[in-house]
């Protein structure tokens, strides 16, 4: 079996303000763009090989992927299933709010107009199942979001609710996953 890489997008305006982005588009900061360029440079210099970059269509991930692609020459395309979870009424609220933290414990809750953890898991697990089938002949870099990173990690590792909630990937961190 093969492998793939996961990269979280660069820093956004709302990351800097400690707000929940979710499915709301929050643009990269200048620092976030610099992080993406540094990641592209590191991928190139490390000799990491990939056939294609798949990215969330939200601008923070799309811009990160396109910067990495321009530096590495790896082609890229949008993959809608990598869109961050829609946190409904919690979008743009403080990330460390205790009400939001409590709401996240309800995996089947849609956050009043959003998407449940179970719905998110279905689309991410289905995508990873497809990538696994192709992994012997094709290596991907997925550029997405921290909520997606949690789901990817849970695909490979059993996690308690607390471990799941606390798991995170830093902006522009590269993580390798082996099937």
Residues of each region from the PLM?
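Catalytic metal-binding/acid-base residues of hydrolase active sites
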Residues: 11, 59, 82-83, 147
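A secondary-structure boundary/capping signal
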Residues: 8, 78, 144-145
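Phosphate-handling substructures
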Residues: 70-125
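Active-site-adjacent alpha-helix immediately C-terminal to a catalytic or transition-state-stabilizing loop
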Residues: 62, 125-179
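Active-site-proximal alpha-helix that buttresses catalytic centers in soluble enzyme cores
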Residues: 2, 7, 11-74, 115
């Amino acid at each position: 079996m093969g492998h793939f890489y996961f990269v979280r997008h660069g820093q956004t305006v709302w990351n800097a303000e400690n707000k929940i982005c979710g499915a709301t588009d929050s643009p990269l900061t200048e620092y976030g763009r610099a992080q993406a360029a540094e990641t592209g440079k590191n991928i190139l210099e490390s000799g990491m090989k990939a056939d294609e970059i798949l990215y969330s269509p939200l601008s923070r991930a799309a811009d990160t992927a396109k910067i990495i692609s321009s530096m590495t020459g790896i082609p890229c395309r949008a993959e809608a299933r990598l869109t961050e979870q829609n946190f409904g009424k919690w979008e743009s609220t403080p990330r460390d709010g205790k009400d939001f933290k409590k709401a996240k414990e309800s995996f089947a809750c849609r956050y009043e107009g959003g998407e449940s953890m179970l719905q998110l898991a279905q689309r991410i697990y289905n995508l990873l199942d497809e990538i696994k089938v192709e992994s012997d002949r094709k290596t991907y870099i997925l550029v997405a979001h921290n909520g997606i990173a949690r789901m990817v990690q849970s695909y490979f590792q059993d996690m308690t609710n607390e471990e799941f909630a606390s798991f995170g990937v830093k902006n522009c961190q590269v993580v390798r996953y082996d099937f």
